[in-house]
């Protein structure tokens, strides 16, 4: 199987889907690997480093001729022309956010494996490290955009406690998963107060125990509680994600209107559509806009801003799956590995993820029934 590592075209995206170390694992296993020129530069990996591990450096067009194309994010519109029948595209594809790309993949007969929908032992194994990074960075961005020079309230999130007692900011975090706890931990490290809004009762108990000695309040998620707590936020971070599907718009425009003027609103799951009615995707180079008097931060690829760290994390997580596909062939790998099967969103043009099918009102078939 010919494996290609392509350079990301998304604005501000410095990650690469495969490190030189992982290229060596593939070539040692007898697989041919091609790497697009400068694909790893943003993460600190030169072309020479890949060549030393057995890869061949190629052009963008040549990379897309591969049987298995390894990416970080969804293909850019300009790359749709390279899709070919039975080609496998691997990455954090977030297909629920774009019906256009899904229809193009269906038309050509592409197989799409989305890392964010791979579930192992009930957890989003590959997404978790990226969620952790996005959560931590969101807390930092909330502090940054709280400053007056960026349009914020002009508050120092840490407060001041030398001979005076000026309280720090309040972070309201919607959701209680990996991204949420990582955001909360950074906010606490900044001496901020944290309110977490979570739906699941078992998770609420877990969070209450986890933060028993910290300045954290855990609130049951209801529309009424959300509307009340969001008014307290200096920084509001939504972390709600439904793997493979578009989340509902739970944070309404009226709720945003009720927030403090100059407060900061961040939606970590914007790459899947987001849960905030007033949010729209932005870029790392132009990350914010103001609406209803609130600073909106809608960057869909936050880990791309710290590519060295993010690349190491995602490459460590995905290599075993990629090796299994290359060693066994996709169909046998799917049969042998239940977690991998959950990542197959489209198989040779057929939608095989229920959430994706529902999001775009498309026909769904269970993956094991399709490959038999």
From Swiss-Prot:
Q: Which residues form the active site?
A: 94
Provide one Gene Ontology cellular component: plasma membrane
**The protein's name in its UniProt record:** Alanine dehydrogenase 1
Coiled-coil intervals: none
What family does the database annotate? Answer: Belongs to the AlaDH/PNT family.
Q: InterPro entries given for it? A: Ala_DH, Ala_DH/PNT_CS2, AlaDH/PNT_CS1, AlaDH/PNT_N, AlaDH/PNT_NAD(H)-bd, NAD(P)-bd_dom_sf
- Organism source for this protein? Staphylococcus aureus (strain MRSA252)
Which reactions appear under catalytic activity for this entry? Answer: L-alanine + NAD(+) + H2O = pyruvate + NH4(+) + NADH + H(+)
Does the keyword Phosphoprotein belong to this entry?
no
Which pathway?
A: Amino-acid degradation; L-alanine degradation via dehydrogenase pathway; NH(3) and pyruvate from L-alanine: step 1/1
Give the Gene3D superfamilies listed for this entry.
NAD(P)-binding Rossmann-like Domain (3.40.50.720)
Which residues hold NAD(+)? 170-200
Q: What is its EC number?
A: 1.4.1.1
Q: Its biological function?
A: May play a role in cell wall synthesis as L-alanine is an important constituent of the peptidoglycan layer.
List, alphabetically, the NCBIfam families matched: alaDH
Broadest EC class assigned to this enzyme: oxidoreductase
Tell me, what is one Gene Ontology molecular-function annotation carried by this entry? alanine dehydrogenase activity
GO BP terms: namely: L-alanine catabolic process
Q: Does the keyword NAD apply?
A: yes
Q: Which UniProt keywords apply?
A: NAD, Oxidoreductase
Which domain of life does the UniProt lineage start with? Bacteria
């Amino acid at each position: 199987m010919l494996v290609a590592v392509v350079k990301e075209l998304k604005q501000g995206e410095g990650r690469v889907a495969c490190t030189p170390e992982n290229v060596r694992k593939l070539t040692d296993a007898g697989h041919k690997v091609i790497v697009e020129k400068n694909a790893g530069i943003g993460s600190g990996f030169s072309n020479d480093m890949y060549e030393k591990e057995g890869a061949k450096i190629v052009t963008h067009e040549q990379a897309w001729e591969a049987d298995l194309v390894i990416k970080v994010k969804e293909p850019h519109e300009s790359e749709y022309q390279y899709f070919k029948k039975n080609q496998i595209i691997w990455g954090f594809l977030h297909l629920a956010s774009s019906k256009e790309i899904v229809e193009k993949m269906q038309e050509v007969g592409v197989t799409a494996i989305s890392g964010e929908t791979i579930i192992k032992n009930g957890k989003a194994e590959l997404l978790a490290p990226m969620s952790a990074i996005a959560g931590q960075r969101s807390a930092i961005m909330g502090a940054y955009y709280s400053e007056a020079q960026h349009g914020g309230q002009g508050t120092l999130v840490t407060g001041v406690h030398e001979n005076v007692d000026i309280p720090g900011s309040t972070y309201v975090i919607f959701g209680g998963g990996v991204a949420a706890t990582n955001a909360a931990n950074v906010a606490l490290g900044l001496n901020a107060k944290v309110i977490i809004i979570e739906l699941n009762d078992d998770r609420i108990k877990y969070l209450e125990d986890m933060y028993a000695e910290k300045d954290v309040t855990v609130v049951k998620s209801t529309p009424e509680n959300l509307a009340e707590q969001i008014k307290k936020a200096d920084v509001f971070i939504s972390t709600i994600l439904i793997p493979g599907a578009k989340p509902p718009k739970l944070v309404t425009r009226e709720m945003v209107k009720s927030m403090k003027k100059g407060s900061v609103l961040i939606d970590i799951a914007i790459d899947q559509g987001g849960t905030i009615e007033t949010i729209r995707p932005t870029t790392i180079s132009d990350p914010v806009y103001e609406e209803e008097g609130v600073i909106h931060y809608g960057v869909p690829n936050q880990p791309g801003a710290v590519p060295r760290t993010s690349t190491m994390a995602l490459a460590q997580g995905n290599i075993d799956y990629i090796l299994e596909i290359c060693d066994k062939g996709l169909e046998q790998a799917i049969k042998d590995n239940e977690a991998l099967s959950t990542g197959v969103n489209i198989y040779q043009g057929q939608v095989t993820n229920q959430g994706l099918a529902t999001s775009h009102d498309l026909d769904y078939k269970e993956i094991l029934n399709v490959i038999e």
